[in-house]
């Protein structure tokens, strides 16, 4: 219950009766302080009147006073300026590293707060706070959604910055890796990222004017040009149609030239995948995009509208894949363009985060602003998370809202972090 005590202290949800220390001195909390989630006391720079005297310093909170010793705070000088030790149960006195006795105060969690908190933890429905959604003010919802949207973009920025580091500071390469990851559309995201990191783009650039060679390197590095990667029933047809063999021979030549090593094809997942999401199709689309010089960050930065961004990312498969989903398996002819749905997802999960991250990196707000503009312009994603919130009465107007709700579920609801959620706050204070 220590987390709940933190919450009660932070929001000053104390009982109406006067507060007092264990030695019966009256306490008035002027400012509970700044919540610290890192090492050190729980709240910094609190302002508290004790027996009429104003104290400014840090506050430490525990379930039991004896936890002070359990956590070895009595041996840690960082806790020497604690002006008040707040506990749910005072079961012992406490001293700091200098041997000075701490001022202690017992705080009881209000019954209604405890009851509502237990409801949030135990209700078998998502979201557990569904009862109060219709009563939330527009200001409360809008401010929280905006904060969640920024939080999600910041989280994605960290992932992009890590890719930039792995790409030795090359933003163009890091953008391609990010784009490739999102071509996995969830299920094959990790495999696509590994594939892109294993792709020597500088070597590919030497053959960029030859689409066949680009596709040979792309498919070969994905580990998809080995005969045993093709289902046995299609192997004979794959060898007879000639395209597989020509690609494989071209890759063998180029892999020897550039000392290439393919990834393990077993990393690719096919189970429950729609055929248009098969790695072969997505890799062919990426090869076409790369060949047409529309897979680079510089081209993307020139796109100032969603329409222009979609034009940059629009692509289709090479001719062979118009009638195939895997090597040797024929299908009805289909140019297999990226669907409007897929384009929207790529803009939400690739274009927007890369603009935001690059804008921060360069200190150019225009790219950050463009990222938010794109989210506002795009329609909200239609997934089970968004639909559940809509069923509770929440209005979801655009992709910014749907991204905020995904962040809310993954980082708050799933982790039971209701005490850090503004909707949870409204629920608890009822």
Question: What spans do the regions from the language model cover?
Answer:
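Hydrophobic, aromatic-lined core segments that form the binding pocket/scaffold
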Residues: 149-404, 417
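N-terminal "leader" segments that precede or initiate the main folded domain
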Residues: 1-7
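Mg2+/Mn2+-dependent nuclease catalytic core
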Residues: 64-86
